[in-house]
Design a protein with these regions (language model features):
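Transmembrane helical segments that form the transport core of multi-pass membrane transport proteins
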Residues: 274-286
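A conserved active-site cap/scaffold subdomain adjacent to cofactor or substrate pockets
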Residues: 230-276
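N-terminal core-entry segment
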Residues: 1-238, 281-283
Length: 286
């Protein structure tokens, strides 16, 4: 968990000097200033949801943040900014923040493991679709929400989960902002629950629940038991893959292969006419 925090902090600081990073911070400031939480790489302080928006965008914008491979979710870009903002707003210490973050990672990854890859198959970015639930859970834990309010916060997230993969067509910035928007939505949901708003209790498995909406009623291959299987004993947080290269994990094996060929066989790139890469069919659209 500490390694993931350090990884995200470093990436966010690197992003803060980029055009998209400056624009993300400016946007978060435009939405309202405050004293609750810090923006990484600046001296701005914002309401917690706005800080999560800025920091989540900084965390993901360079495509250098970690991935949980099987669930295909960029977990830490959602979890760490939400935990930082919620902990600051709730004046909690680092130990409490880490505990809440681990809870967020465990739930976030399991949401994707119910139907690995199937959000992407339907054009949804699993990171941003599942991310609000993790952020809401983190905030609920740090802000002292009892079970009923926590359930309401998660229920409210069912109406906040969103994220289109259309950015793959033209390289739009929407991918960069997805974890930030997820964090913002989750923290708002937790705050709504604290104010008495209610959310549907069967937000995941209900007839109009999360999985029926996003992978289709009766469609897809889903296993809802994976939401709780091994919870508290089998730590998905330990399965996060940190990136050696700032690009999609799907490309890393080919980069490794190219580097190996260069180092071991001294191949001159000018001698290469073409390269054939064999990939899983699910990776083709990406």
């Amino acid at each position: 968990a500490e390694t993931a925090f350090l990884d995200i902090l470093g990436i966010a600081l690197a992003s803060s000097g980029m055009e998209f990073g400056r624009d993300a911070v400016a946007l978060a400031c435009d939405l309202g200033m405050g004293e609750e939480a810090s923006v990484l790489g600046s001296d701005h302080r914002l309401p917690a949801p706005n800080a999560a928006l800025a920091n989540g965008t900084l965390a993901h914008g360079l495509d250098y943040d970690d991935t949980h491979a099987e669930s295909v979710i960029h977990a830490s870009a959602c979890v760490v900014p939400a935990a930082l903002a919620a902990a600051e707003a709730g004046r909690k210490d680092g130990r409490a923040m880490l505990a809440a973050a681990v809870a967020g990672w465990e739930v976030l990854v399991r949401l994707g493991l119910v139907c690995p890859g199937q959000f992407h198959d339907r054009g949804f970015h699993a990171t941003s679709v599942c991310g609000p639930f993790a952020a809401a859970l983190i905030a609920a834990k740090l802000w002292g929400c009892p079970a009923e309010q926590t359930a309401n916060a998660l229920g409210l997230c069912g109406s906040m989960a969103a994220g289109s993969m259309e950015f793959l067509t033209d390289g739009a910035w929407t991918k960069r902002i997805h974890p930030g928007w997820a964090g913002h939505s989750g923290l708002v949901a937790a705050r709504m629950a604290l104010r008495g708003f209610t959310g549907p209790k069967e937000v995941f498995e209900g007839r109009f629940g999360f999985y029926n909406l996003y992978i289709g009623k009766g469609g897809g291959d889903r296993d809802l038991s994976r939401l709780t299987s091994g919870l508290g004993t089998e730590w998905k947080t330990l399965q996060l893959d940190h990136k050696p290269f700032p690009c999609c994990h799907f490309t890393h094996a080919f980069i490794d292969a190219a580097l190996f060929l260069r180092e071991e066989h001294r191949i001159d790139p000018a001698e290469i006419d073409s390269v054939e890469c064999r990939i899983h069919p699910r990776e083709m659209p990406v």
